[in-house]
Amino acid sequence: DLDGLTLLGERQHKFLSEWGKKQNSSVMKAVLSQTGFCGGAHLHGSKENRLHADLDSNGWPQKGRNKALKLIKEANAVHIAGDQHLATVIHHGIDKFEDGPWAFVVPAIVNNYYSRWWWPKNEKSGKKSNKVLPWNGRYLDGFNNKITMHAYANPDSDSSGSGYGIIKFNKKKKEVTFECWPRYQDVR
């Protein structure tokens, strides 16, 4: 991490800080951003193109990323993003694993021209894996950010991983459900 780099501007920090302090038991909060706050994809464009650290993500600069995540967590908000061409559900870590907010990066509506994959180099599950998918659990991304991968939709299905996300807020139970659907699936 380099000193002097910023991720969010001062107005954005101020807004998140003030918004986060407004607590109302009947309100659930979400922060929307163009892209995720970590390197949630390893392979870009093809299975032969492994990136160590994706500079197209908001995973850097780390100080800026961590400051933003702390504000999102203090607001008791979830993070919803796009732009990564790979649907993921990640529990962010700031100082330690899982001490940050939850994030859902929704899939791309079209994903067959520049796909991305979650594919750890060692092809092993991380610690605390839920065993639902082969490569979930605790990992460090290419920027050394702590992330816990809970779900991902690699482009190895008929839909190439393209689709859309639905986020359901249950105010009574104080629960958020992230759903990922193939592009042509009618979920009515």
Give the positions of each predicted feature.
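Long, structured stretches of catalytic cores involved in phosphate-ester chemistry, encompassing
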Residues: 1-188
